UniProtKB/Swiss-Prot annotation:
Provenance organism: Homo sapiens
Stated name of the protein: Tether containing UBX domain for GLUT4
Keywords: Acetylation, Chromosomal rearrangement, Cytoplasm, Membrane, Nucleus, Phosphoprotein, Proto-oncogene
Interaction with GLUT4: region residues: 317-380
Lineage summary: Eukaryota, Metazoa, Chordata, Craniata, Vertebrata
Membrane topology (UniProt): Peripheral membrane protein
Amino acid sequence: MAAPAGGGGSAVSVLAPNGRRHTVKVTPSTVLLQVLEDTCRRQDFNPCEYDLKFQRSVLDLSLQWRFANLPNNAKLEMVPASRSREGPENMVRIALQLDDGSRLQDSFCSGQTLWELLSHFPQIRECLQHPGGATPVCVYTRDEVTGEAALRGTTLQSLGLTGGSATIRFVMKCYDPVGKTPGSLGSSASAGQAAASAPLPLESGELSRGDLSRPEDADTSGPCCEHTQEKQSTRAPAAAPFVPFSGGGQRLGGPPGPTRPLTSSSAKLPKSLSSPGGPSKPKKSKSGQDPQQEQEQERERDPQQEQERERPVDREPVDREPVVCHPDLEERLQAWPAELPDEFFELTVDDVRRRLAQLKSERKRLEEAPLVTKAFREAQIKEKLERYPKVALRVLFPDRYVLQGFFRPSETVGDLRDFVRSHLGNPELSFYLFITPPKTVLDDHTQTLFQANLFPAALVHLGAEEPAGVYLEPGLLEHAISPSAADVLVARYMSRAAGSPSPLPAPDPAPKSEPAAEEGALVPPEPIPGTAQPVKRSLGKVPKWLKLPASKR
């Protein structure tokens, strides 16, 4: 409906036949028919006899403001309608789409409400009579009508449906009484399982059909909802088999389980994963023996080497090497000027051209990126895990002390919390971990460091519900070092990362949060290789129409 007068937002000016102008406040969901009715009600005209005209075109009154392609403060004019809209109400054919994908179709008058539309179908009438704590919701385009009161007060004409056909989505949402967050029926019971079995961020090929659907699609309603719940329960255990990256171990983020021997896993690996460059030909046995017999003979020859090979690399214990550093312990190489000159903040033509070239090259790189297969994506993940066997994490405390430690990519956020709690001065302190920007609280303790985007290095912030003077134990604070010394320690333990180049593209390492942000502000970004470099021109050839705020010619 038209927004009340006053306040911000868009507005439209309508010229009535009597020469008076009326200003109507509109929102993106306001229908143009409501603008005409509001103007006619104030000027005592019949809205069925007039249309709205913008410049030389007569507008479609069933369109919403967001789809009408009209500028803000547009000046419209009321003109006599080519054919009167008086008489019996127009019929609209409505297809009501349920959460299971089925549709119920029938014709309704444009003056009927959404509640009457829902009550017309027996399947939906049962859901409305026995909601079971859920709230009926109708979704049309981008408008969402929630609750019985809103459904009874919303007509098809108010949505702009005065003829033709339309599709309205119907779902039953249940709202959490604590957080007032909408959710689907039965979703709270499986929330922990969904969090524990969350797919990897880069494994988009393994996403199930339910993961790609919108959250409202999981809502249930009446008898059709029980059917969908049965489908979901039978579909849940049928998960795709997971092939371990390094021949053994457990799935990242999954429940721990017994390790697999390398011989069985290597035999079951697909060809695309066993050899990224292409499928390798099987070796011919000279003695004509079975390959399994040859593997047993090799295992008997060197059992110790076989045991070391079966031991997964990502499950080997890693030394945490806990170190505490503080930015104030860093010796400044040079004194920073007390105040930067004004010329530093002036925007030059070269700066604009350089930034524009970077944005164009980045957009071109994303648009022309080739499509990769699921096997290639899995090979990329495997290459990343092999390139960075350790994860360097730093936890920043409110008192600016930084706790540094090393982890495996397959370790969970819960392991990180245990590491932080073991070095607190007060182990009973209630705290939470988050990363920024944007602020994301790491509340899922079963999520791996790889899934939490803390790979291969990241800065994690610690927040406490009750502030304390000192957070870390005094023994660590006595041996605090400078951030540069901590960098040397990270470079020493992460030296394996700079190994031989791989045929796969190297992953982009996560930026390390160091107290050198001011240096990065003074150094211009390096140009991306292979992209068009901006042409540097002198400021004397600046066009006359280009006026900079503080340019000096």
